[in-house]
C-alpha cells in the first residue's frame, strides 16, 4: 500500500501513483493531511466547488503534517500526470519550492493554499504561482489574543501561547499576531510561548508544564484547535476549567462543541471550505485564460476572513 492517500466520493483508497502516466481528472489538489477536520472541511469545499464549476478534481494528502518528504514526492509524481493545474498547501514554506518551480516550467497552472510558499526562493528557482489563498494569520492570532485581553479586563494577568510547528509560516504568523497584541497591553504578561507541533497530546504535555510553572496564569492562546483541545484537558486536569481561558484557532466542529460546553472559551474560526473553493476557482479561471502567469508577475492574493466563536 502506497503511503500517499487519495480521497474521493467519501471513500478512502490507496493510490499507487506510478501505475499510470495520465491524470484521472483535470485538476489535482495536494492538502497537508486529512487527519485534521480543518483539511477535511477544505476538501469538502473543493469538491462542492468542482461540482459548481463542472470540473473534475483529484484530492490528495500526506499521511501527516510532519511528513515533508512524502509531500514532496507526491507533488513530483502529480506534476508528471498531465493535470492542467495543481493547487497545493505546502507543509512548510520551503519543502515544495523546487517541484513547484519545475511544474511551473512545464506549463501547469498552480495555486498556493493556506501556507505560503517562499516566493523569493521560488522565483530564484525559476517558478511562480497564479494565486495565493489564505486567512490573514497574523490577524487571526491578534483576534484570539485581543479577545483574551478584553476578557481579562483592566486587571489583566499572565498568559501563554501554544505555537504550531517550528518553521511553519501559518503557525508563526498566528504566534506573531498574538504576541504583538499581548505586548501592546500593559496589563498582560506573556510568560510562555512554546510549540506543540499541531499535536493534541504534545499540547496537553506542554500546557501541563506551563500551568505547573505558572500557577497564576489566566489564559492560553493556541495556534490551532487540535492543540487547544489538549490544553483544555490540561486545564481540566489542574482543576482550573473556567478559571484559565483557552482560546483556539480554526473553528473545527469538536472545538465548537467544547466552546458550547464551557470546556474552551473561544475559537477563531477560519473558513477552510471557502479557502479551498476559492483556490480551485482561481486555478480553473487561470487555465481558461490559456496563459501561465509570467515569472515576473506577482500572484493574485486572496484573503478569506475569520470569525470569533464564543459561547
Swiss-Prot record:
Gene3D superfamilies: 3.40.50.2300. Pfam families: Peripla_BP_4. GO terms for biological process: D-allose transmembrane transport; D-ribose transmembrane transport; transmembrane transport. InterPro entries: Peripla_BP_I (IPR028082), SBP_2_dom (IPR025997). One of its GO terms (molecular function) is monosaccharide binding. It is found in: Periplasm. Keywords: Periplasm, Signal, Sugar transport, Transport. Its main location: periplasm. Residues 1-23 form the signal peptide. One of its GO terms (cellular component) is ATP-binding cassette (ABC) transporter complex, substrate-binding subunit-containing. Belongs to the bacterial solute-binding protein 2 family. Part of the binding-protein-dependent transport system AlsBAC for D-allose. This is D-allose-binding periplasmic protein. It comes from Escherichia coli (strain K12). The gene is alsB.
